[in-house]
Structure formats: C-alpha cells, structure tokens
Amino acid sequence: MHRRLFIGAVLLLSGCSTIGITDLFQDYATQLRPVRQAVSQNNIASAQQLLPSNSRGHSNYLLNQLETARLEFLAKQNSQANETFEAVYQNMEKIRQAAKVQLSAGLEQTNSLLTNDSVIGYEPAAYEMTMLHSYKALSYVFDKQLESALVEVRRANKVQEDALKDNQAVLDEQAEKAAEGYPDMAELIGNVKNGFQNAFTFYLSGLLYEADKQFDDAYIDYKKALEINSENSYLQQTVL
C-alpha cells in the first residue's frame, strides 16, 4: 500500500512538492522560502532549524506549529508530528467554536474561548484542516496504525462534507451555467470543488478503506477524488 500511496501522491500533487497549509498566507510563506529550499534539497534537519520560531501570542503561531508538524513528519518523527498536529487541531477547534459564538452573539471578542487575543477572528480554512488530518493519517500509516489513520481520514472527510454544504450555493450556480451550454460540466464542477476540497485526501481515504476491506467506501471516495480532478489518468484507472 505504501508504494501506491506514494505514486498516487506524486501524480495528484505534481508540481506541489512544498504543499503546505501556510501557502495560503503570502507574508508567512515569504518567511518560509529558506525552509522550502532546504526541503527541496531533502535537508529536513536544516529546514527545521531555519523555521521561524513564533511565540504563542504571535498571530502566525498556529501556522508555525502546522509547519513544525509537517517538518517533523518529513523527518519521520511520526510520534512527535502527531502530537503537534493534534495540539494544533485542538486549538483550531477552540477557534472555530469561538467564531460560531461570535457570529451568533454578535460579540467583538470571546476571550474565555481563546488562548490569546491575537488570533481572534482567525478561522482555519477547510483545506488547512483537511491537510492536517491527511498528514496525521499518513503518520499513522507509516507506524502501521491503520485504525488511527482511518479516524483521521474520517475527520478529514467530515471537514470536506461541511465545506461542500457551505459552498452548495456556488456549486448550484455553476451547475446552472453548465446547463446553459458549458462544454464540460464535470471539469467546471471539479474546478469549483477544488477550491475547498482536496482530491488527494479523498484518494488517501479510499486507499485506507480498501486496506481495511471496506471496498464500497473506498470506491465512493475514489469517485469523489475523480470528480475534483477529472483529468487525472491515475484516478481514472482506479475508478474505471
């Protein structure tokens, strides 16, 4: 399964060798250029040393911790990586809950639910949360903990399902355009979904379900991955 996992990852993420949750934030991404260069040279130890150290009160603290966990994963420090990822996940859940309270109560701040004021208003994107769980699942795979890996892909898929619901209006709008004569509806819908869902994560969960002999669930997630990345020949061969 490891071989299929790596082949699929390369094909699905070609051109994205430095895929990281922090890529969505240009200012922080700029700071990470030396880190990425070290990673591209397969010098993970150097990358870990070059990673900026942000205090808990820094606005980029959680992003920094995500990158810390990713580098621990690349360094095959799986146990430590999972601890760091889990800590970030728990902090993100607090922030998401605080955001809901702010929205429903119209509050400017909810200090009791946040670890520090500087992160008020920051709600992690679905793509960030999805990749967090994907990295954790991969760490468990390499430690031969299939059940724990399945827990993480279920978490990831829950994030993706919620993102789909949140963006249903956009999908409906694009479907209407497709009905008016757009040449390739599958490609259009896939492009829209790619903005908030992740084909690789669906592919990963498909692999893990297949390894657990949950073949129907595996096929469903392979199809979801293909819907997002309809031109990927590897996914086409997997589904057909």
Model region roles, listed by residue range:
Residues 25-26, 59, 126-127, 189, ...:
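Residue signature of alpha-solenoid helical repeat architecture, marking inter-repeat boundaries
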Residues 16-37:
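Bacterial Sec signal peptide processing site at the extreme N-terminus
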